[in-house]
């Protein structure tokens, strides 16, 4: 509802609003509604396979002059099938790719040389978190989870790929960034980051 209010303040109107479970793939009726309402931008929380089904339904009704914006549930390799189906496909994600960090390229080169494949999605965060966890254990001088958690809140943890990891008192990562990506040429390309706008 906050997004709707913000859009109204920008003199933009939400003309179609629907909710679906995480399995629905029958979107023919919705596609007709979107066409009738002349929707140009679709903001979605659908999974990738659902978003693809929606785009296919939009093609059936010849309503392809639209852009789709989703979250990291559509920032997948499967969504590359959406190329050319509509005017634009965008995704936001708090998981920035390793190549977007200055030390990401050497990390990727070493990883691929060692394992002959790229790391799993977000794997560099797991790699970095092991360094931070190790530092917290050393600072806590204990293996007790509560002591480690307390230590993690008090350190500026060195993370070899992303730089640092710090947390607030609720356990949320401080200074996390969200990337906005566009599907172009079969790849997700970073368009902007929240820490740089």
Please tell me what each predicted stretch does.
Residues 1-197:
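Extracytosolic ligand-binding ectodomains
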